[in-house]
Amino acid sequence: MRTLWIMAVLLVGVDGGLWQFENMIIKVVKKSGILSYSAYGCYCGWGGRGKPKDATDRCCFVHDCCYGKVTGCNPKLGKYTYSWNNGDIVCEGDGPCKEVCECDRAAAICFRDNLDTYDRNKYWRYPASNCQEDSEPC
């Protein structure tokens, strides 16, 4: 619960970055990113280390790697522009935050495509002590 409370506090009044990612997940996956992915496996949520535990956790690993390559825009705060076109996310504009939009888009689609691996009973609030293996490179 503490993690959810912290995330809720951080997102209050925010209309870019993580809030846009949350809205994208809701639209694509039909579930809340905060309630479903903020503390899942070794990589979903703040930080991340070890080996991804399933395909859903790997979505978060790849998303973290993608954020790590972004320059000129804070992925957690930067605002980007996107729209929906025939059920697809379209990242718009040419600014540096478009990279963040593309990272978020790929993660939302990855979550949707791997819903069959999502195991809340096994990996929700997964102990960090179980994520001690060496991380693979991005």
Swiss-Prot record:
Molecular function GO labels: calcium ion binding; calcium-dependent phospholipase A2 activity; phospholipid binding; toxin activity
Active-site residue list: H63, D104
Enzyme class: hydrolase
One CC-aspect GO term: extracellular region
Xref: CDD domains: PLA2c
Pfam families xref list: Phospholip_A2_1
GO biological process, alphabetically ordered: arachidonate secretion; lipid catabolic process; negative regulation of T cell proliferation; phospholipid metabolic process
UniProt-annotated binding residues for Ca(2+): Y43, G45, G47, D64
Enzyme nomenclature, EC number: 3.1.1.4
The record's free-text note on cofactor binding: Binds 1 Ca(2+) ion per subunit.
Family under the similarity heading: Belongs to the phospholipase A2 family. Group II subfamily. D49 sub-subfamily.
Protein name: Acidic phospholipase A2 1
